[in-house]
Protein backbone atom coordinates (compact mmCIF):
# COMPACT_ATOMS: atom_id res chain seq x y z
CA UNK A 1 0.00 0.00 0.00
CA UNK A 2 1.31 3.45 -0.90
CA UNK A 3 1.54 5.82 2.05
CA UNK A 4 2.85 9.30 2.65
CA UNK A 5 4.93 10.39 5.61
CA UNK A 6 5.34 13.91 6.92
CA UNK A 7 7.99 15.63 8.96
CA UNK A 8 7.66 15.22 12.73
CA UNK A 9 6.41 18.62 13.81
CA UNK A 10 6.58 17.69 17.51
CA UNK A 11 10.39 17.79 17.49
CA UNK A 12 12.35 20.27 19.59
CA UNK A 13 10.20 19.90 22.70
CA UNK A 14 6.86 20.76 21.11
CA UNK A 15 3.84 18.81 22.33
CA UNK A 16 0.75 18.19 20.22
CA UNK A 17 -2.57 18.85 21.92
CA UNK A 18 -5.38 17.74 19.68
CA UNK A 19 -8.55 19.81 19.66
CA UNK A 20 -10.43 16.91 21.24
CA UNK A 21 -8.41 17.15 24.45
CA UNK A 22 -8.78 20.94 24.54
CA UNK A 23 -12.52 20.86 23.81
CA UNK A 24 -13.00 18.24 26.51
CA UNK A 25 -11.71 20.67 29.15
CA UNK A 26 -13.90 23.54 27.92
CA UNK A 27 -17.38 22.22 27.23
CA UNK A 28 -19.60 20.08 29.40
CA UNK A 29 -21.38 18.02 26.76
CA UNK A 30 -22.41 14.39 26.55
CA UNK A 31 -19.84 13.69 23.83
CA UNK A 32 -17.00 15.56 25.52
CA UNK A 33 -14.12 16.41 23.24
CA UNK A 34 -15.05 13.90 20.56
CA UNK A 35 -18.37 15.51 19.61
CA UNK A 36 -18.17 17.20 16.22
CA UNK A 37 -21.24 19.42 16.39
CA UNK A 38 -20.30 22.66 14.62
CA UNK A 39 -21.84 24.91 17.29
CA UNK A 40 -19.81 23.15 20.03
CA UNK A 41 -16.62 23.45 17.99
CA UNK A 42 -17.25 27.16 17.45
CA UNK A 43 -17.94 27.70 21.16
CA UNK A 44 -14.81 25.79 22.14
CA UNK A 45 -12.68 27.85 19.76
CA UNK A 46 -14.02 31.02 21.37
CA UNK A 47 -13.29 29.78 24.89
CA UNK A 48 -9.87 28.14 24.41
CA UNK A 49 -6.85 30.21 25.42
CA UNK A 50 -4.03 28.65 23.40
CA UNK A 51 -4.22 31.01 20.44
CA UNK A 52 -6.29 33.97 19.33
CA UNK A 53 -9.85 32.64 18.78
CA UNK A 54 -10.26 34.55 15.51
CA UNK A 55 -7.00 33.11 14.18
CA UNK A 56 -8.14 29.63 15.17
CA UNK A 57 -11.54 30.05 13.51
CA UNK A 58 -9.84 31.25 10.34
CA UNK A 59 -7.61 28.16 10.41
CA UNK A 60 -10.59 25.87 11.02
CA UNK A 61 -12.55 27.25 8.07
CA UNK A 62 -9.49 27.21 5.79
CA UNK A 63 -9.01 23.55 6.72
CA UNK A 64 -12.74 22.87 6.18
CA UNK A 65 -12.61 24.33 2.66
CA UNK A 66 -9.52 22.32 1.73
CA UNK A 67 -11.07 19.18 3.23
CA UNK A 68 -14.15 19.81 1.07
CA UNK A 69 -11.94 20.16 -2.01
CA UNK A 70 -10.14 16.90 -1.24
CA UNK A 71 -13.21 15.00 -0.03
CA UNK A 72 -11.86 14.40 3.48
CA UNK A 73 -14.52 12.55 5.47
CA UNK A 74 -12.50 12.17 8.66
CA UNK A 75 -11.44 15.60 9.97
CA UNK A 76 -12.51 15.01 13.56
CA UNK A 77 -11.32 16.74 16.74
CA UNK A 78 -8.46 14.27 17.20
CA UNK A 79 -6.58 15.17 14.04
CA UNK A 80 -6.07 18.89 14.33
CA UNK A 81 -4.95 21.09 17.20
CA UNK A 82 -2.10 22.97 18.79
CA UNK A 83 1.62 22.69 19.35
CA UNK A 84 2.79 23.76 22.79
CA UNK A 85 6.43 24.63 23.36
CA UNK A 86 7.18 23.79 26.98
CA UNK A 87 10.43 25.77 26.94
CA UNK A 88 8.82 29.05 25.87
CA UNK A 89 5.29 28.32 27.16
CA UNK A 90 3.94 29.42 23.78
CA UNK A 91 1.29 27.69 21.69
CA UNK A 92 0.67 27.74 17.97
CA UNK A 93 -1.73 26.04 15.61
CA UNK A 94 -0.36 22.68 14.50
CA UNK A 95 0.21 22.09 10.79
CA UNK A 96 -2.58 20.21 9.05
CA UNK A 97 -2.00 16.48 9.36
CA UNK A 98 -3.77 13.13 8.96
CA UNK A 99 -5.27 13.61 5.53
CA UNK A 100 -5.45 9.88 4.86
CA UNK A 101 -9.19 10.02 4.26
CA UNK A 102 -8.93 12.34 1.27
CA UNK A 103 -9.44 11.50 -2.40
CA UNK A 104 -11.63 8.44 -1.80
CA UNK A 105 -8.94 6.19 -0.29
CA UNK A 106 -11.13 3.06 -0.26
CA UNK A 107 -11.83 3.24 -3.99
CA UNK A 108 -10.48 0.10 -5.63
CA UNK A 109 -9.97 -0.39 -9.37
CA UNK A 110 -13.61 -1.40 -9.92
CA UNK A 111 -14.91 1.71 -8.18
CA UNK A 112 -12.45 3.93 -10.04
CA UNK A 113 -13.47 2.47 -13.40
CA UNK A 114 -17.17 2.87 -12.57
CA UNK A 115 -16.69 6.49 -11.50
CA UNK A 116 -14.69 7.30 -14.63
CA UNK A 117 -17.28 5.69 -16.91
CA UNK A 118 -20.44 7.05 -15.29
CA UNK A 119 -20.89 10.78 -14.76
CA UNK A 120 -23.65 10.14 -12.21
CA UNK A 121 -21.22 8.06 -10.13
CA UNK A 122 -18.63 10.84 -10.30
CA UNK A 123 -21.19 13.51 -9.40
CA UNK A 124 -22.39 11.46 -6.43
CA UNK A 125 -18.84 11.45 -5.07
CA UNK A 126 -18.59 15.19 -5.49
CA UNK A 127 -22.01 16.45 -4.46
CA UNK A 128 -23.36 13.78 -2.07
CA UNK A 129 -20.41 12.11 -0.37
CA UNK A 130 -18.10 12.02 1.25
CA UNK A 131 -19.54 14.21 3.96
CA UNK A 132 -17.65 16.09 6.64
CA UNK A 133 -17.16 14.53 10.07
CA UNK A 134 -18.42 17.88 11.39
CA UNK A 135 -22.14 17.94 12.11
CA UNK A 136 -24.71 20.72 11.90
CA UNK A 137 -27.78 20.09 14.05
CA UNK A 138 -26.85 16.44 14.46
CA UNK A 139 -26.30 15.68 10.76
CA UNK A 140 -22.97 15.32 8.99
CA UNK A 141 -22.37 18.32 6.78
CA UNK A 142 -22.60 17.77 3.03
CA UNK A 143 -19.69 19.89 1.84
CA UNK A 144 -21.23 21.07 -1.42
CA UNK A 145 -24.58 22.02 0.10
CA UNK A 146 -22.94 23.81 3.03
CA UNK A 147 -20.54 25.78 0.84
CA UNK A 148 -23.29 26.76 -1.60
CA UNK A 149 -25.69 27.78 1.19
CA UNK A 150 -23.34 30.58 2.27
CA UNK A 151 -24.78 30.19 5.78
CA UNK A 152 -21.42 30.79 7.47
CA UNK A 153 -19.75 34.12 6.82
CA UNK A 154 -16.46 32.75 8.19
CA UNK A 155 -16.65 29.83 5.76
CA UNK A 156 -17.44 32.20 2.90
CA UNK A 157 -14.34 34.23 3.76
CA UNK A 158 -12.26 31.04 3.82
CA UNK A 159 -13.51 30.19 0.33
CA UNK A 160 -12.34 33.60 -0.85
CA UNK A 161 -8.92 33.01 0.75
CA UNK A 162 -8.41 29.43 -0.41
CA UNK A 163 -9.86 29.21 -3.93
CA UNK A 164 -7.39 31.71 -5.47
CA UNK A 165 -4.54 29.65 -3.98
CA UNK A 166 -5.64 26.45 -5.73
CA UNK A 167 -3.56 26.04 -8.87
CA UNK A 168 -5.10 23.13 -10.73
CA UNK A 169 -2.27 22.83 -13.24
CA UNK A 170 0.25 22.37 -10.42
CA UNK A 171 -2.00 19.85 -8.69
CA UNK A 172 -2.52 17.92 -11.92
CA UNK A 173 1.24 17.86 -12.56
CA UNK A 174 1.89 16.72 -8.99
CA UNK A 175 -0.66 13.91 -9.31
CA UNK A 176 0.85 12.82 -12.61
CA UNK A 177 4.29 12.54 -11.00
CA UNK A 178 3.23 10.49 -7.96
CA UNK A 179 5.22 7.25 -8.21
CA UNK A 180 3.70 3.79 -7.80
CA UNK A 181 0.23 4.78 -9.01
CA UNK A 182 -1.26 2.86 -11.90
CA UNK A 183 -2.47 4.63 -15.04
CA UNK A 184 -6.03 4.08 -13.79
CA UNK A 185 -5.23 5.70 -10.44
CA UNK A 186 -3.54 8.67 -12.12
CA UNK A 187 -6.57 9.20 -14.37
CA UNK A 188 -9.01 8.73 -11.50
CA UNK A 189 -7.33 11.20 -9.13
CA UNK A 190 -6.86 13.81 -11.84
CA UNK A 191 -10.51 13.49 -12.86
CA UNK A 192 -11.81 13.53 -9.29
CA UNK A 193 -9.80 16.58 -8.24
CA UNK A 194 -10.76 18.54 -11.35
What are these regions, as identified by a protein language model?
Residues 9-65, 69, 87, 149, ...:
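ATP-dependent phospho-/nucleotidyl transfer catalytic cores
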Residues 9, 69, 81, 97-100:
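Anionic group-transfer/hydrolysis microenvironments
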Residues 83-194:
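C-terminal catalytic region of ATP-dependent kinase domains
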Residues 2-7:
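A conserved loop-to-beta-strand element in the N-lobe of protein kinase catalytic cores
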Residues 76, 81-84:
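Conserved protein-kinase catalytic-loop segment immediately C-terminal to the catalytic Asp
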Residues 67, 72, 77:
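Catalytic-loop of the protein kinase fold
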Residues 58, 62, 78, 91-97:
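Internal, well-ordered alpha-helical scaffold/interface segments
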